[in-house]
Amino acid sequence: MTPAALAELLRNTAVDVLASRDLDTSVIPAAVTVERPRNPEHGDYATNIAMQVAKKAGVAPRDLAGWLAEALTGQDGIDSVEVAGPGFLNLRLAADAQGQILREVLDATDAYGRGAKYQGLKVNLEFVSANPTGPVHLGGTRWAAVGDALGRTLEAQGAEVTREYYFNDAGAQIDRFVRSLIAAARGEAAPEDGYGGAYIGEIANQVLEAEPTALDLPEAERHETFRRIGVGLMFDEVKRSLHDFGVDFDVYFHEDSLHTSGAVEKSVEQLKESGHLYFADGAWWLRSTEFGDDKDRVLIKSDGTTAYIAGDVAYLRDKRNRGFDLCIYMLGADHHGYIPRLKAAAAAFDDDPDAVEVLIGQMVNLVKDGKPVRMSKRAGTVLRLEDLVDAVGVDAARYSLIRSSVDSALDIDLDLISKRSNENPVFYVQYAHARLSSLQRNAASLGIDRGSVADADLSLLTHEREGDLIRTLGEYPRVVRSAAELREPHRIARYLEDLASAYHKFYDACRVLQPGDDQATPLTIARLQLCEAARQVLANGLGLLGVSAPEQM
């Protein structure tokens, strides 16, 4: 019995108990919480459901807990129930209930942990969206790893996810980038407000290879040539580096298209017509304070040009017009102000502000030999995606970027994540999978066939470490669901570390294959089934993170 199944049993039992006493059943929450107690002597799981609803139902918590304990005792999968403290319920599962967890894992295989929480929900997930003026920096790299993992996690809960990259090919930064390319092509220093680094010279040379007479063209034509070829080359490099990192997008949306198509102008006119814009100080302002923003925002400047938010408004309208139920934006730490302004923009169009979610991520720092790594040799100013991958590889880079909450700044110790030891979290998890794969190969080499889980006597798995491992496997579906609901894929990484720890402790305490034995006992078969279930869940979890599950290391 998984925690999810136990929670459902508790809820149904609570409904029956209250209904049988003519008490209000509406006080029972839609989802009942069950947790593993810190002290194993308190049982396999605990819940505070009686304390949570007793007051609303008009009864004493311990009385309700006692009624629930009586009703649960003897039900399938329940070994014992006891009331503790002010009204906690401590539950022990029957041996067969633990075996049921293994059967669920091995019957579902790759599908174990998947659910239908967001079945049918169309999600637009926009992440990275770095300016096309340089390589993907470490902040963008963090979003690449986390965003891709979040997309996989939402899909595991039934969502239809479109991964989108917003290509900022409009605005002043493009002009500075182009002027930097032209200066490099001439052998001159970068403009004061331009971009430096070896990559600028490399792209400038590629522009000249594609268009040898580019520098001889009239100024406007020269600028457009360097813009067209240079921005295209930079964007191709960004896409290539992300692809090599295991991240691909379904849509690359060009900001410039919002202006050339008239989408920005149309959005502004609609807001004028609805009365949500007003004219003051020579500019047009969005009445965003009416929708919870801390100040009104300029959409059309006094010189007649559009402010950046005008493009954001049009872009949000475009997403919603494409049929997305939920638009998630993953932005850097300097974008906190986008949360109220995007929600205000939605409300101004009589749209649902809750259809917009903004996730804010903090910075990433690299540390080597105990000191910060400051400079990229090629970018000249900032560390790139490739710098991290070159140092530690794709798997270690992705896992290290995902395993911590994006709410906090992240320091990545390059020395630590390069180690082949249990100190290195990604090695620790991958090694557990490789060890489990090796165990199954060794069994096969001895002629031992674990057979079907339906034929195994799983009631033999009575050791404390076996129980710990089984219960940890049972937690996985709930972890995936909460990671999707909270938009926190790092929960999956931390769970995998707990699972690897539970497996290593089991392996040290419980011999699976006896040296020299080629005859499998029923206990051997049961333990091989447990090991295969653990391997399967590790593989499933690593897959959601976009990290490989090696069969040998």
Swiss-Prot record:
The keyword Ligase applies. One of its GO terms (cellular component) is cytoplasm. A motif ('HIGH' region) lies at residues 130-140. InterPro entries: aa-tRNA-synth_I_CS, Arg-tRNA-ligase, Arg-tRNA-synth_N, Arg-tRNA-synth_N_sf, ArgRS_core, DALR_anticod-bd, Rossmann-like_a/b/a_fold, tRNAsynth_Ia_anticodon-bd. Keywords: Aminoacyl-tRNA synthetase, ATP-binding, Cytoplasm, Ligase, Nucleotide-binding, Protein biosynthesis. It catalyses: tRNA(Arg) + L-arginine + ATP = L-arginyl-tRNA(Arg) + AMP + diphosphate. SUPFAM superfamilies: Anticodon-binding domain of a subclass of class I aminoacyl-tRNA synthetases, Arginyl-tRNA synthetase (ArgRS), N-terminal 'additional' domain, Nucleotidylyl transferase. It is found in: Cytoplasm. It comes from the Bacteria. Its EC number is 6.1.1.19. One of its GO terms (biological process) is arginyl-tRNA aminoacylation. GO terms for molecular function: arginine-tRNA ligase activity; ATP binding. Belongs to the class-I aminoacyl-tRNA synthetase family. Monomer. This is Arginine--tRNA ligase.
